[in-house]
From Swiss-Prot:
Location of Citrulline modifications: 57
Gene source species: Sus scrofa (Pig)
A single MF term (Gene Ontology): structural constituent of chromatin
Sequence positions bearing N-acetylalanine: 1
Function: Testis-specific histone H1 that forms less compacted chromatin compared to other H1 histone subtypes. Formation of more relaxed chromatin may be required to promote chromatin architecture required for proper chromosome regulation during meiosis, such as homologous recombination. Histones H1 act as linkers that bind to nucleosomes and compact polynucleosomes into a higher-order chromatin configuration.
Name the record gives this protein: Histone H1t
Biased composition (Low complexity): 1-16
Length: 211
């Protein structure tokens, strides 16, 4: 009778130790839930990439989208519901525009706001063009200044040439005057010599008379 109460004392701690084992088993369930949420982001990326590649103006249908995703290596049959949820979320965010149909069925295309990358490239090109225009405007201004400098130099050279020509003309005029003045002096000298000759001619007669 004394050994009987010892057995239930051993069974009580065993029952107390079991609940923490059950709590540990609940943690992996939360991890699996987080792992299921991750593929939705990849699905939305694949959908946006497929629509950016498509050249259809009216948009891409759901069947064509599934084909593009399957070609990219995505399992469409297992993740059909995720594709539809991804399409709805993208339409709600404004990244996609539904051109036809309702809900997940129909055709979709990227909105203008969802493609900023090509616009950035287009914006960068005009910026480079503006810099080129500024450089060209600076270069265009420099030839004008060079032309103005050339004109100023030409005006200076022409003024110097005119001054040199006027100096030459004055020198030539002086030389001509100097040439003319000795000729006049020469012409005047013989006139002064004629009376002497007459005196010499008259002098012999006077000598004969004296004789």
């Amino acid at each position: 009778a004394e050994t009987a109460p010892a057995a239930p004392a051993d069974s009580v701690p065993a029952s107390v130790e079991k609940p923490p084992a059950k709590k540990r088993g609940k943690k992996p369930v939360g991890l699996t839930g987080t792992s299921r949420k991750a593929p939705s982001a990849s699905v939305s990326k694949l959908i946006t990439e497929a629509l950016s590649v498509s050249q259809e103006r009216a948009g891409m249908s759901l069947a064509a989208l599934k084909k593009a995703l399957a070609a990219a290596g995505y399992d469409v049959e297992k993740n059909n519901s995720r594709i539809k949820l991804g399409l709805k979320s993208l339409v709600g965010k404004g990244i996609l525009v539904q051109t036809r149909g309702t809900g997940a069925s129909g055709s979709f295309k990227l909105s203008k706001k969802a493609a900023p990358e090509p616009r950035k490239g287009k914006v960068k090109k005009p910026a480079a063009a503006k810099t080129k225009k500024l450089v060209l405007s600076r270069d265009s201004k420099s030839p004008k200044s060079a032309k103005a400098n050339k004109r100023a130099k030409k005006s200076r050279t022409t003024a110097a040439q005119k001054a040199a020509r006027s100096g030459r003309k004055t020198k030539e005029a002086k030389v001509k005057q100097q040439r003319k003045s000795p000729a006049k002096a020469r012409a005047a000298k013989p006139k002064a010599g004629n009376p002497k000759l007459t005196q010499q001619k008259t002098n012999p007669r006077k000598a004969t008379n004296r004789k």
